[in-house]
């Protein structure tokens, strides 16, 4: 099995909402996104696919690992399903909640390396942003044959989506009507909405990632956000 070193470029994924109008039910086009903030500073843990454990019809995961530096890495292997799941513990209810799940089966091409053969690996690193609800994904420019499946939960915001300190009907309207997954490549770029699937019951977005870099970017930070 050939292993591929990771790139130094980082591509970020974040959740955000924009400011709403003064009227509780009114919404206006945003000048820019306002990132969703954690309702508190959570404690994170991560589990990755355990390649030594083979369970029919189930994903076998390693024991939870505390994220001291808020980052976790795993080897994505072409032709094999590999996953990472990041959870957080809330001091509000003292329960463990899901935050992110990333599953890959077909890492196809790495910048500077080329196409991967079946069984070749690339090291993927996920870094959690502790100030806003978001993560960074690397290596940049990694392309997938079959898209990687990304799922991210936003209930860590505590229901306060517009940042006014309370969770009320305005937040519910924002969530149900205009919340979406967006991204940008660099600070000077406008935000662009992605065709992600939203689950109001789970308070999550799911998106099929064709690659970590949506466009040909050299040394730019790509941010992804939930916005309206």
Residue ranges and their predicted role:
Residues 1-8:
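Bacterial N-terminal signal peptides that target proteins for export
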Residues 16-19:
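C-terminal motif of bacterial Sec signal peptides marking the signal peptidase cleavage site
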Residues 21-97, 108, 141-145, 158-228:
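Proteolytic cleavage junctions
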Residues 130-137:
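Short beta-strand elements of extracellular/lumenal beta-sandwich folds
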Residues 146-150:
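Structural beta-strand segments of beta-rich domains
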Residues 151-155:
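Short edge beta-strand/loop segments characteristic of extracellular beta-sandwich folds
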